[in-house]
Amino acid sequence: TEPEIRVMILELLKKEGIIFHGAYDNLLLNTENGFIKSINLDGRIIEPELVISAVGFTPNNILAEKAGLRLTPRGAVKVDRSLKTSDPSIFACGDNIEIINEVTKRTDYFPVATVAHDFAHVAGENAAGGSAVVNTVVKNIAVKILNKFQVSVGITEAEALQNSIPFKSIQASAPNLVKVMPDSRQVFGKIVYHALNKNILGAAFLGGKEVSGYGDIISALIKLKSSAHILADLNYNYTPPLSPFINLLSILGRKVK
């Protein structure tokens, strides 16, 4: 996600007494009888109570390899828009294939259950003789971090750089409810948009459950190739127990230049 949100998440962890160790060149696991007893972090020994392996995902392509199917450089099963593999009688979907990123128009890999579900319908229909095709995908991922939620939509600034897309970004914080309400708290949002045509490229949010809705709105606007200016023109609902008087998205839209 965006660097500003990474800093905020680190502060959340610190407040809860959780120590974060990152960016080590040499990380060694010291094991005994198959159990991790300690971790060597560039010479510093830490004895954890619990170890969780969260090193990312790779496609499970064992069956595809045995079937002789063509794979991509990422190790995913290569498919066309009908989800047909290199064997015309075999279709693939889910976490073992790549998708076409709506923003970059390039192949990408992010195993998301909602995308897998949608693609499964297409693969099943075509395996039965149909002619359906899949669409490009907007990355729209939410995770819970302690008492907050983080949402990433589209591409980040770093991904825009990697894909040579000229971009600008704006950010703001605003209360999720009017300040007199007991559940009012700050929500952070950042929009990445094309430097020339102002179309929305991506966004990131950190706050309460409301950020899920923000993410879905941005995802739809990316699909519609909408300018970031439209965020200031939308009509947002308002009622004190549920929604803010001035929506964070509206504030962000007014900052677009």
Briefly describe each language-model feature range.
Residues 35, 45-125, 217:
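FAD-site-proximal beta/loop scaffold in flavoenzymes
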Residues 40-44, 86, 146:
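Short strand-coil-strand connectors
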Residues 22-24, 73, 171:
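Short loop/edge segments at beta-strand edges and connector loops
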Residues 19-21, 91, 168-170:
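General small-molecule cofactor/ligand-binding pocket signal
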Residues 4, 106-111, 206-207:
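Short glycine-enriched, charge-decorated loop/helix-capping segments at active-site entrances
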Residues 26, 36, 40-45:
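A structured beta-alpha segment of the ubiquitous adenosine-cofactor-binding alpha/beta core
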